[in-house]
């Protein structure tokens, strides 16, 4: 029903990272 999955921006917790970011796991997974 037109639900938009928000993407995670740089420095935000990894869910679905906005392109071209990718998940980087150190202490806490964040998008980089």
UniProtKB/Swiss-Prot annotation:
Gene Ontology cellular component list: extracellular region
Source species, domain of life: Eukaryota
Coiled-coil intervals, chain numbering: none
GO MF term set: toxin activity
4-hydroxyproline modifications at: 6, 13, 20, 29
Keyword entries, A-Z: Disulfide bond, Hydroxylation, Knottin, Neurotoxin, Secreted, Toxin
Tissue specificity of this protein: Expressed by the venom duct.
Disulfide bonds listed in the record: 7-18, 14-23, 17-31
Transmembrane domains' residue ranges: none
Record's subcellular location: Secreted
Free-text function comment from the UniProt entry: Intraperitoneal injection into fish (0.5 nmol) provokes vertical suspension and paralysis after 6 minutes.
Domain notes: The presence of a 'disulfide through disulfide knot' structurally defines this protein as a knottin.
This protein's name: Conotoxin pr6b
């Amino acid at each position: 029903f037109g639900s938009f999955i928000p993407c995670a921006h740089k420095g935000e917790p990894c869910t679905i990272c906005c392109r071209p970011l990718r998940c980087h796991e150190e202490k806490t997974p964040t998008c980089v």
